[in-house]
From Swiss-Prot:
One GO cellular component, as annotated: fungal-type vacuole
Name of this protein: Carboxypeptidase Y homolog A
Propeptide residue span(s): 18-128
Gene: CPYA
Glycosylation (residues): 122, 213, 508
Active site per database record: 269, 460, 519
PANTHER family documented for this protein: SERINE CARBOXYPEPTIDASE CTSA-4.1, SERINE PROTEASE FAMILY S10 SERINE CARBOXYPEPTIDASE
Amino acid sequence: MKVATSALLVGAVSASVGPQQQVLKFPDSFSELKEGAWSKPLHKLEESLKTLTGEARAVWDEVAMMFPESFEKAAFFSEPKPHTRKHDSEWDHIIKGADIQNVWVENKNGDKEREIDGKLENYSMRTKKVDPSVLGVDKVKQYSGYLDDEEEDKHLFYWFFESRNDPKNDPVVLWLNGGPGCSSLTGLFMELGPASITKDGKIKHNPYSWNSNASVIFLDQPVNVGYSYSSGQVSNTVAAGKDIYALLTLFFKQFPEYAEQSFHISGESYAGHYIPVFASEILSHKKRNINLQSVLIGNGLTDGLTQYEYYRPMACGEGGWPAVLDESQCKAMDNAYPRCASLIENCYNSESVWSCVPASIYCNNAMIGPYQRTGQNVYDIRKPCGSNSLCYDELDWIQAYLNKKEVMKAVGAEISSYESCNFDINRNFLLQGDWMKPFHRIVPGLLAEIPVLIYAGDADYICNWLGNKAWTEALEWPGQKDYNKAEMEDFKIDGKGEAVGQVKSSGNFTFLKIHAGGHMVPYDQPEASLTMLNRWLAGDFWA
């Protein structure tokens, strides 16, 4: 769902984190994007500290002295979720990646080659046909189940809803919430899915669901998020990308009736990290059955160096809403940003855990902390934060609903309990240096092949529209000059009435600001968000 600020401001460093030189180099081509060093065993902190350069140790010690509470030692990995795996006979479909990899075809040169690229032999997918009448979430055809990686004991939960309109021809959309560590079932029941959950646990129909004109897959990832589970962990974005490619490959192989339609990846918040990597992973496979046509990122975190500069303006009345902080607090943030920027630049240059973790902890405390301490909602600058730690009571209602035995049985969930956000995962990603890595560097490669939409509700603080617009304009790509010349134009529902936002577009790149929308645009502006989706999928901005 969102960037979890409680983990942002705590960031408790554990007794074991990644070694200093676990470096993720960003690719000149999709095929160069590899998991690489991230698959290596984690070292103990005490051992890894011995490898630090003097400069890196000085930075680490400096930030640790500033925020000692953020460097308390704690268990790095959470305990695995209790679960009970269902017998294969309880599933309607099971497809194995090894069977797909054994399919060979003859190419135009007469040579034999695999029909589909990728390392799939360790994966399988189990599917259950969900009876729409049992839960009443929607009347459309639904499937749920797990992608299994048997070698690493990873099990990712998904829930598919067919389009309400014309499923044989309508696009297919994958939705990803952020966190990292927040369930995409939050997006299903709070934002863009077929129904929401009321305070008393009832189902409420959503007329603006994104499956109005598209089939939608909601995926709980990485492992140990939502209904997903594993005895191991995924603590960086690139590692998670391999699972997404496998899931989609197996899904479209099992259900070829959806494979010919256009496919799009969408998400919000930390999905600003996920989506560039996941899309590039898909595009790196030239022989694939995934018809990826575009990506959509809402209120995302993609380029920290550019985006963190805009926390002070947003908090101090320059983002279109009244100031939350007073003059002295704003001045303190002005003074803090140069150090923050320097730390992020070090992270960008080295992509090292020992540079990126201090950057995350310093910048989050200095640039987000002053705002959060006011009690104002970081996801909506117009409101105070509610009683829930993530500011929305609806999360408690959704969590209670998804913990009902009859709900878990209906969708085939195998874990003992559901939680909306797993803060251990949030911390793990931060402590692997993933938070501040320059994922925007992947975007030019995407733009060379597919359209990219960056949209933002204008009332969000945590991933605000100022920063999102700024990074799209700062991005170096062949179309940068023309994109920056493009004017912001009114965005209207059906082209009529008052503007619900402003949009600029050039080539394959589009930025859209939604008026009076917070971090979760479909929650605050459901009609505008559906209009945005439908027009985007129709190619209005990039055809």
